[in-house]
Every structure is written in C-alpha cells, then in structure tokens.
C-alpha cells in the first residue's frame, strides 16, 4: 500500500513541473465549482436549486472546453490526462450524493455510480504507480456526457417551478414544463446504465493491470 501511494506521489511530483495552461486551469476550476455546488446544495439558501443548476452547468462547460482547447492547441499533458477524468468523477459523484441527501435519487443508483467511479479511479492510481497513464476512452466520455445531462435535467426538474413570474415572463415554464417531468428520470436511467456498462468494459480491457498484482 505504501509503495502504491509512493508511486502515485512520485508520479504527481514529476508532473508538477507542467505549466498551468488554460485547459489545466479549467480542470482545476471544476474542483472549485464542485465545492461551491455542494455548499449551495447543503446550505439550501433561497433558490438553491437554481443556483446549483447554474454552478453545475458552468462546471459541465469547463469539462467540454478544457478537452477541446487542449486538442486544438496541442496542450495535452499527463496532468490533464490524469486530473481531467478525476475532476469529472468528483463532480458527478458529488452531485449524485447531494441528490441522495435531498431525496431526489434512489440509493442504489448512487451506489452504482460512486462504486464505478471509485473502481476506475483506483485503476488509474494503480497505473500511475507503475508510471502508466490510462486515458479516458470514447465510451467513457459518452458516459460522462450522459451523467452531466442527467444531473442538469434533475436540477431543472427541481428548480423550474421556483421561477414563478420570471419563468412566465421569459417563457421558461413553457420551455421546460412539457418535457422535464419525463426526460429527467429517463436521462437518469440512461446515465446509470452507461455508467455501469462503461465501467465493466474499462475494467475488462485493462484487466492485466490489476490481475498481475493478485
């Protein structure tokens, strides 16, 4: 266990010399936005669902733009390869746990999502201890998109009724009302199914990495 942790710390130390380019700054900002999201959800100020919706939407946008900018400008770094998916996992798991605390999501769904993300994170840490970097796969990226869509849809579901007069003036209630009641639960199911399936596939494809230590 000590060698495992030591290998990971050594890996991070070696990569700490990488300059904080724009994609990496966006990745780090996702950690900050996630903390702010959790603070709002659990403090429950007035219109907290809408505030949480705005914070999570911005966090989701950083996930899109950090990868896009990194690929476009050739700014892909080992730091980004490791920390970008980690930021995604913390963001998503935090949201699902917060939803569980609010009574919005069944416990078994949260268990599947959190267990999957912890398992994949553990696999990446194991790879890091061996000086290997496991990049996210396409199926995993689709999974992350489905999770973000599901979380935003659930936040819309629980916030749009608060919009009252403003919602009627700007037509938001008309825009969201007809579909959010069925789309949010459906997107949640899709996200959980993709989360479980992508996790099984990722663990199977990289089985040699952890089976070698058994």
Predicted regions and their residues:
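C-terminal membrane-associated helical module and adjoining short loops/tails
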Residues: 2-27, 33-34, 53-60, 132-214
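Juxtamembrane helix-capping/reentrant segments at transmembrane boundaries
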Residues: 20-23, 66-88, 131-143
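Residue-level signature of the transmembrane alpha-helical core
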Residues: 31, 54-57, 86, 111-114, ...
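Active-site His/Glu-centered metal-binding helix of metallohydrolases
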Residues: 32, 61-69, 86, 90, ...
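Membrane-embedded alpha-helical segments that form the functional core of polytopic membrane enzymes
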Residues: 33-82, 95-111, 178-193
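Small-residue-rich segments of transmembrane alpha-helices in multi-pass membrane proteins
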Residues: 35-37, 83-96, 143-153
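Helix-loop junctions at the membrane-solvent interface of multi-pass transporters
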Residues: 40-44, 100-101, 126, 156-157, ...
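Helix-adjacent hinge/juxtasegments
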Residues: 81-133
């Amino acid at each position: 266990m000590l060698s495992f942790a030591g290998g990971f710390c050594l890996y991070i130390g070696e990569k700490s010399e990488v300059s904080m380019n724009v994609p990496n700054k966006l990745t780090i900002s996702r950690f900050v936005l996630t903390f702010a999201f959790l603070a709002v959800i659990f403090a429950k100020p007035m219109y907290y669902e809408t505030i949480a919706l705005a914070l999570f939407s911005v966090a989701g946008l950083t996930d899109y733009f950090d990868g896009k900018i990194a690929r476009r400008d050739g700014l892909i770094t080992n730091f980004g390869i490791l920390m970008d998916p980690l930021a995604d996992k913390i963001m998503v798991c935090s949201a699902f746990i917060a939803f569980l605390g609010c009574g919005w999501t069944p416990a078994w769904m949260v268990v599947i999502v959190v267990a999957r993300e912890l398992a994949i994170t553990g696999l990446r840490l194991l790879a890091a201890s061996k000086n290997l970097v496991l990049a996210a796969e396409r199926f995993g990226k689709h999974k992350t998109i489905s999770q973000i869509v599901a979380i935003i849809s659930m936040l819309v579901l629980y916030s749009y009724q608060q919009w009252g007069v403003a919602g009627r003036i700007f037509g938001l209630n008309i825009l969201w009302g007809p579909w959010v009641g069925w789309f949010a639960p459906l997107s949640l199911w899709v996200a959980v199914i993709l989360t479980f399936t992508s996790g099984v596939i990722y663990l199977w494809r990289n089985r040699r990495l952890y089976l070698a230590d058994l």
